Amino acid sequence: MPLTKNFILYDKHRRIIHLPAEYYGEAMKVKPDGFSHKVNLSPSQLESLQENGTLDDPMLRPLAKYGLVAESIHIPSTTRNINFNNNESWGYISVGKHNKSARPPIRVIFKLFASDSIDFSMKVSEYRAFLNNLEEFYVADVRQPFKLYKVMINQEIEFEQPQYHVPYGECALEFVKAGSIYGESLHTTQTIRQEGILFNDKWAYGMGTLFDEDSWRYSFFNQQPRFYNAGTEEVKLIQQKESIIELKINQSASWFEIVDGKGTVFRLNKAVSTGDVLRIIGSEITLNGNNVIGETNYNFLIVSKGWNRWEIRNLDRYEFKIDFRFLYD
């Protein structure tokens, strides 16, 4: 019977990793709505898969004859720190903020199938080395393939066999977080600006995106920025190292400010002129490629959940772009 994979591995650059296996000539085509259907692989696709372990179409999940299979995946929610006061009359009363602080490990049950007991032993060695060499990587549930969680393995990798000579074993692995406690979108907001969200296999139901094309705007010309965060969480841009704010200035000014929807004010206390370009990439702040963090007020901006209305002060002529990944609980 063909075997299916219920999760997806991505390397640290968010490129899909295909597990080594021996394959049937079939694959499951994963669609953005989470459903899938079986397709036949061409001879050239099957040859590429056997030799390189990859397919040109990243949404094709090859069906394996022998190899490692993710039987199930459980992605728990984040946990909260809730402070209580014990009142004799009212019992425990919640006080203070309910901050999300951690995410329990993501648990995946693997099954390993081999042609005989010797093949099983060799495959165990192969997969141990494969998994231990991953270091930091991303995982996703195949039903939500565009929500990625950055993790690493911090345990022994052992496959339990029902009997010694049976060419089958099972391994339960826990992936611990390696960075943000949240899942993040595989693609960024500028992808939406350039391509929209329809029919491009980059966004899916359940990711919070809207069909309203006004919500696809993340670039603005001489307009106060108004853009949409489709994630379930706010985005502290200083913590998202690949996030980009770009402001191309088309006038002269002695200073300017960018104000986010929470009222946080970023200020550059430096004269600018036409053609100057400010970039904030994570924690790096440059003007025309030169570090200018010392000439700011050291505030970093936050993208709120839902609609964001930002303000550019002391500038009327500019081009503003923002690029970030949505975050999900």
How does the language model describe each region?
Residues 67, 73-82, 88-93, 103-109:
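Non-catalytic, solvent-exposed interaction/assembly segments
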Residues 138-184:
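Short beta-strand and beta-hairpin "edge-sheet" elements
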Residues 14-20, 146-150, 263-269:
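Surface-exposed loop/edge segments in extracytoplasmic proteins
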Residues 189-329:
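Intrinsically disordered, low-complexity segments enriched in serine, threonine, and glycine
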Residues 99-104, 131-133, 165-169, 237-241, ...:
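Solvent-exposed loop and beta-edge segments used for protein-protein assembly and interaction
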Residues 1-80:
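Polar/acidic, low-complexity leader/linker segments enriched in S/T/G and N/D
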Residues 4-10, 111-156, 309:
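Short, acidic/charged, Gly/Pro-enriched secondary-structure junctions
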Residues 90-118, 166-181, 308:
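Oligomerization/assembly interface segments of phage tail-like spikes and tubes
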